[in-house]
From Swiss-Prot:
Reaction(s) this enzyme catalyzes, per UniProt: 2-C-methyl-D-erythritol 4-phosphate + CTP + H(+) = 4-CDP-2-C-methyl-D-erythritol + diphosphate; 4-CDP-2-C-methyl-D-erythritol 2-phosphate = 2-C-methyl-D-erythritol 2,4-cyclic diphosphate + CMP
Designated name of the protein: Bifunctional enzyme IspD/IspF
Organism, as annotated: Clavibacter michiganensis subsp. michiganensis (strain NCPPB 382)
Sequence segments annotated as region (2-C-methyl-D-erythritol 2,4-cyclodiphosphate synthase): 258-410
Binding, 4-CDP-2-C-methyl-D-erythritol 2-phosphate: 264-266, 290-291, 312-314, 385-388, 392, 395
Region (2-C-methyl-D-erythritol 4-phosphate cytidylyltransferase): 1-257
Gene label: ispDF
Stored PANTHER family: 2-C-METHYL-D-ERYTHRITOL 2,4-CYCLODIPHOSPHATE SYNTHASE, CHLOROPLASTIC
């Protein structure tokens, strides 16, 4: 399905406009989140039942000053991003636009800048992944930009000892950390100067301050906030969850965790195509079943339903539903994930062990993990064993899968 690049909600840039908000905020939410391993764009990952984007947007909309906000989204999840914006912005929806991002972060920021209304003279660029950034930090950066007439970034002193090393790992020396800071977002700039810097930019830069400086702009650092850390890895996500739980008075997230186990077995049926782990395997003998016989997907469903206390796949879906005759495992996974979330749980992760002599999983493991992760909206890991040629799986008579799932009560 194709989408217009801009979801109508605010006027596009009007070069000479003076009426309207002077502050613009570009919220970059177009990242894939590959390192997080969630299978969905990082900004749509939940912390405490609320997406990172929603938390970031809530902080922005908490500003006392009127602002025009542009959320930059991946083209693959434009509708989902717009739905989050609709829910968070409410009556302020008219001041928030959603645009499609570029191939790089720099391209995404450029798209966001182009969508700001003409009255904006001060721009803040913020990563949606820094979801716990307090509203006060946005206000402080905006004030500093106007006071300095320069670029302004929040930062915190580097506390770890920093070493310089060569490509072989040989330590070349210790860096004096007294003048080092780790920078955060939002990063603020005079709008005209930032537009000019982007117009001249030829190389890719790691942040907007570097791009601004490369074009001759001056950048100042103001005190940052420990809560403005970026959620990049699973560890960062756990840290954010614990902070949210603490603030909500809900205690440790571990007290709300539940696990489940699921097992599924299907006999080989050479007359059928093979669907396993959400993938079609051309040239391989298929599996017998009412649906497509995807033992991996079915075991995952049972594990998730068990963890949430919802029963099992047979009791939920049955074999008498004509709509599910021949249905692919991805259909069951998406429906199961929806049931689990409707029951008040967040899916933390799923791990699956496949027992089979064929197909060989290793060459397509990463592809399968991406498909399965996207279907349940959480990280999925896949492993395989031939069971040393023992039993019905070792003889090639069938395929078995065992899955474990972890969910968290919200």
């Amino acid at each position: 399905m194709s989408h217009d690049p801009v979801v109508p909600s605010a006027p596009a840039t009007d070069g000479g406009a003076t009426d309207g908000p002077r502050l613009g905020v570009v919220v970059v939410a177009a990242g894939s989140g590959t390192r997080l391993g969630a299978g969905i764009p990082k900004a749509l990952v939940e912390v405490g039942g609320v997406t990172l984007l929603a938390r970031s947007l809530s902080s922005v909309l908490g500003l006392a000053e009127e602002a025009h906000v542009v959320v930059v989204a991946p083209d693959t999840h434009l509708a989902e991003t717009s739905a989050v914006v609709d829910a968070v912005a409410g009556a302020a929806r008219g001041s928030v636009a959603v645009v499609v991002g570029g191939a790089t972060r720099q391209g995404s920021v450029r798209a966001g800048l182009a969508a700001l209304v003409g009255s904006v003279d001060t721009v803040l660029v913020h990563d949606a992944a820094r979801a716990l950034t307090p509203t006060d930090l946005f206000a402080a950066v905006a004030r500093a930009v106007r006071a300095e007439g320069a670029g302004v970034v929040p930062g915190l002193p580097v506390t770890d000892t920093v070493k310089r090393v060569d490509p072989a790992g040989e330590c070349l020396g210790t860096v004096d950390r007294s003048d080092l800071v780790g920078v955060q977002t939002p990063q603020g700039f005079p709008r005209a100067a930032l537009d000019a810097a982007y117009a001249r930019a030829a190389a890719e830069h790691t942040d907007d301050a570097a791009l601004f400086q490369a074009s001759g702009g001056r950048v100042r650092v103001i005190p940052g906030d420990a809560l403005a850390f970026k959620v990049t890895t699973a560890w960062d996500l756990r840290r954010a969850e614990e902070l949210v739980a603490r603030d909500a008075g809900a205690g440790s997230a571990s007290s709300r965790l539940r696990s489940g186990i699921g097992t599924d077995v299907h006999a080989v049926d050479a007359s059928q195509p093979l669907w396993l782990a959400g993938l079609h395997w051309p040239g391989e003998a298929g599996l017998a079943g009412h649906s497509d016989g995807d033992a991996v997907s079915h075991a995952m469903c049972d594990a998730l339903l068990s963890a949430a206390g919802l029963g099992d796949i047979g009791g939920i879906f049955g074999t008498d539903d004509p709509e599910l005759d021949g249905a692919h495992g991805e259909v069951f996974l998406r429906r199961t994930a929806e049931l689990v979330r409707d029951a008040g749980y967040r899916i933390v992760n799923v791990a699956v062990q496949v027992m089979a002599v064929r197909p060989k999983l290793s060459p397509r493991r990463a592809e399968a993990e991406r498909i399965l992760s996207a279907a349940v909206g959480a990280p999925v890991s896949l492993a395989g064993t031939t069971t040393d040629g023992l039993g019905f799986t070792g003889r090639g008579d069938g395929v078995a899968a065992v899955a474990t799932a972890l969910v968290e009560r919200l």
